[in-house]
Amino acid sequence: MKKFSRILVVLAVLSMAMGLMTGCGNKKSEKSDNQSSVEQIKKNGKIKVGVFSDKPPFGYVDKNGKNQGYDVVLAHRLAKDLLGDENKVEFVLVEAASRVEFLQSNKVDVILANFTVTDERKEVVDYALPYMKVSLGVVSPNGKVITDVKQLKGKKLIVNKGTTAETYFTQKYPDIELLKYDQNTEAFNALKDGRGAALAHDNTLVYAWARENKGFTTGIKSLGEHDFIAPAVKKGND
């Protein structure tokens, strides 16, 4: 776990620094936008980073009200890189469905909330280099483990709004009834309460959750495309 965390830190800091400071294009206007964005962050004296409040081990708020997780570590490193002080970061709590809106409305400078790169999202945000590769996973109760999507016929599948899981099952399996929730906590509680037969999310998340919650198994370990997770900034601020 510690080795994985260190790898994520190095890769993410490099990708975010490249994304925020060098840009992806060659146009003068893009370079000007990049400089303006970084200069504004420096002028503000802090960087506002969107993170999850309930998605361990990536982003969560602990019992003392403190932000924790890989994404939080990455945010501190980014603040150190840009501003010379890892504490010059303001954490803004986001839900999956609000990540784009928070960027577009300047509520955050960067999204570090397990944001999967998709063609649709590329039209409205700019991504830095990816730092993690994921696919979808499906977790379900022991004794009623879902190992094939066909087993979900006539059953309810729990997903989070605004996630790749919601998009995937809506497009590929429109006959499967989806129970949609805003917060990860709500979704996983729904699974515990038996409101759905299974829950679909990024496989990295469901693996971690199943390890911490006895009585549940990730029966479908990889589903759909292998996608990438990357930091995102407002369109034009790449």
For each feature predicted by the language model, list its residue ranges:
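C-terminal motif of bacterial Sec signal peptides marking the signal peptidase cleavage site
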Residues: 19-23
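Extended ligand-binding regions for polar small-molecule ligands
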Residues: 25-31, 72-73, 77-81, 161-163, ...
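Extracytoplasmic small-molecule ligand-binding "clamshell" domains
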Residues: 31-111
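Alpha-to-beta junction loops
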Residues: 47-48, 85-87, 94, 104-113, ...
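Short loop->beta-strand "edge-of-pocket" segments that line small-molecule binding or catalytic clefts
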Residues: 47-51, 68, 149-163
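Periplasmic-binding protein-like
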Residues: 53, 132-140, 203, 207-238
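Acidic, polar ligand-binding/catalytic clefts
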Residues: 76, 88-151, 218
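A ligand-binding cleft/hinge motif common to bilobed small-molecule-binding domains
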Residues: 98, 115-123, 168-171, 192-226
